[in-house]
């Protein structure tokens, strides 16, 4: 192929330069294919070893990150984004509650005769007491011969079942707040003298939690009503060994967890409505979705014969579809259901409608709200996943990422002091940055994809109160991952619901600065001296004004 080729005869330098660029990109493509084939080969080898019964390849983690980009799997951008912060150590004495005071005296036998008393020097020492508080209640008992009835004094609230509210609240706090497993909790309780069965402990964590389920719904509704925007993310979990998706919906004052069988758009819609019964409506918005989804005109014309602008239950809508569109395929049927359900969600007034979601670019978030804001950090991970092999391409990628995060910093500054002039400048700067063309084809393709997301990435220019990233909900989703690692999933739908409810309480209490243990104890004991978290969300939301940009001028 190269017989007779003499590089010294090259006259057209520009064409030669273009040829070199193409060859370098070909090297990148071949390197990527080679790495993919290596990974596939290793997976197949591992499967062969498993079938043969031989030990699998040990998963040995390196002590230091690999310098080879092809084997790197850390896509974090924290180093690029991190800014040094001034560290000031503050006193914590004013935050410590003093439970008792003890005066320590000097042994007079060791003092000289000329000493003078100069007062006291105070030292605060924190400690904890972990011991039993077993009580023998002597309940008064009366008998009425005339009524043939016995009158017996009642146990205090929270002491039902021969265990007190302090113990019940501590078990819930250990399991859901500290991620302790049930066997470890049993070991700890038995070590301090509590006699309790495995089944009793499990029932405390799962059964008869209706009061907490009700409070969760109230907190969620308060969170949705307190802000027109919400953040969302999901993660994998298990129930009875079956795959499930757990969704985390949040903003700065609360977090709510919901588990569904799938992560499709209708499942997310159920989450946004707190699993209220689905309704369906065929209106202009629904037909707009159908057109966007590319549903055939024959299906659309048939749907236009159904009752318009009418809220239908799921049973009613499915019956109409079966009557008028019996041959409707599964994919088009799914699009029809999604379009009508989302339109009904937007049209109803009984439940708060989310106007903007902050999330990643997963397809299930789209069309659920009027606006969608994308996470800049998630978008940046796409660039971190590029694995250039050629040194020049590495330099091009690093140079572009420096500009990317510099622009991100400018957006952060805009959030603090938004002005129309800065908004216009940042819009132009976005166009300039993402019009960049390099000689690295994979990078150019990635830049073009980011440019296509301009509206969602620059949503912060319209609504400066929303975050530029989705880290808050991603961290909330990790709480489920940590719980999953401890318990390996739940074993019943009741257990899943209890986990979602109490993790909602854990995360929300932390955001509001409320003690999770004290709150659970307050509710179990029946004291109800602490305000509901829903009330706190409403109160603090008024102070933060989370929807300022949606309010009329």
Language-model segments: which ranges?
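Short, flexible loop/hinge motifs at secondary-structure junctions
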Residues: 1-161, 202, 232, 277-339, ...
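Mobile genetic element proteins and their domesticated derivatives, centered on retroelements
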Residues: 23, 30, 44, 51, ...
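Short helix/loop capping segments that flank catalytic or ligand/cofactor-binding pockets
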Residues: 119, 152-154, 239-241, 248, ...
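Conserved beta-strand -> loop -> alpha-helix junction used to position metal-binding or nucleic-acid-contacting
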Residues: 356-357, 361-364, 368-400
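RNase H-like nuclease fold core
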Residues: 191-194, 198, 203-359, 363, ...
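Short, charged amphipathic recognition helices of the HTH superfamily
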Residues: 177-188
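Acidic/histidine-rich catalytic cores and adjacent linkers
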Residues: 305-333, 349-367, 398-553
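Short, amphipathic alpha-helical "recognition" segments used to contact nucleic acids or chromatin
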Residues: 165-178
């Amino acid at each position: 192929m190269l017989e007779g080729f003499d590089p010294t005869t090259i006259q057209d330098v520009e064409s030669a330069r273009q040829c070199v660029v193409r060859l370098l990109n070909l090297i990148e493509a071949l390197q990527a294919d080679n790495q993919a084939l290596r990974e596939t080969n290793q997976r197949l080898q591992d499967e062969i070893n498993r079938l043969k019964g031989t030990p699998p390849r040990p998963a040995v983690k390196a002590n230091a990150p690999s310098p080879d980009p092809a084997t790197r799997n850390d896509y974090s951008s924290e180093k690029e984004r991190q800014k040094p912060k001034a560290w000031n150590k503050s006193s914590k004495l004013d935050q410590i509650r003093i439970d008792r005071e003890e005066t320590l005296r000097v042994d007079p036998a060791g003092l000289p005769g000329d000493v003078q008393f100069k007062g006291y020097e105070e030292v605060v020492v924190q400690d904890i007491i972990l011991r039993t508080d077993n009580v023998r209640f002597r309940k008064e008992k009366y008998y009425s011969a005339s009524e043939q009835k016995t009158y017996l004094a009642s146990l205090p609230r929270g002491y039902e079942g021969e265990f007190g509210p302090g113990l019940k609240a501590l078990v819930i706090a250990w399991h859901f707040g500290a991620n302790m497993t049930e066997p470890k909790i049993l070991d700890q309780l038995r070590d301090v003298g509590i006699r309790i069965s495995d089944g009793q402990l499990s029932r405390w964590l799962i059964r008869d939690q209706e009061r907490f389920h009700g409070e969760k719904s109230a907190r969620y509704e308060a969170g949705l009503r307190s802000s027109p925007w919400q953040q969302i993310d999901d993660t994998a979990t298990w129930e009875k060994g079956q795959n499930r998706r757990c969704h985390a919906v949040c903003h700065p004052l609360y977090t709510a967890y919901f588990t569904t069988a799938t992560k499709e758009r209708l499942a997310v819609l159920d989450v946004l409505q707190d699993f209220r019964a689905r309704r369906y409506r065929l209106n202009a918005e629904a037909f707009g979705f159908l057109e966007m989804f590319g549903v055939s005109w024959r299906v659309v014309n048939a749907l236009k014969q159904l009752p318009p602008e009418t809220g239908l239950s799921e049973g009613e809508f499915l019956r109409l579809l079966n009557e008028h569109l019996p041959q409707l395929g599964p994919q088009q049927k799914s699009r029809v259901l999604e379009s009508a359900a989302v339109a009904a969600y937007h049209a109803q007034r009984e439940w708060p409608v989310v106007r903007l979601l902050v999330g990643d670019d997963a397809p299930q978030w789209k069309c659920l709200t009027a606006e969608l804001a994308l996470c800049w950090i998630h978008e940046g991970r796409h660039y971190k996943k590029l694995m250039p092999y050629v040194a020049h391409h590495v330099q091009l990628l690093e140079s572009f990422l420096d500009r990317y995060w510099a622009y991100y910093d400018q957006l952060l500054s805009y959030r603090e002091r938004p002005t129309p002039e800065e908004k216009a400048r940042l819009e132009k700067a976005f166009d300039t940055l993402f019009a960049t063309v390099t000689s690295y084809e994979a990078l150019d393709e990635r830049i073009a994809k980011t440019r296509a997301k301009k509206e969602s990435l620059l949503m912060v220019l319209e609504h400066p109160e929303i975050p530029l990233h989705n880290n808050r909900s991603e961290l909330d989703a990790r709480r489920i991952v940590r719980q999953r690692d401890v318990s390996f999933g739940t074993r019943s739908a009741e257990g899943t619901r209890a986990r979602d409810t109490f993790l909602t309480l854990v995360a929300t209490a932390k955001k509001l600065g409320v003690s999770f243990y004290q709150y659970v104890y307050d509710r179990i004991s029946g004291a109800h001296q602490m305000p509901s978290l829903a009330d706190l969300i409403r109160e603090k939301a008024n102070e933060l004004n989370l929807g300022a940009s949606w309010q009329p001028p």
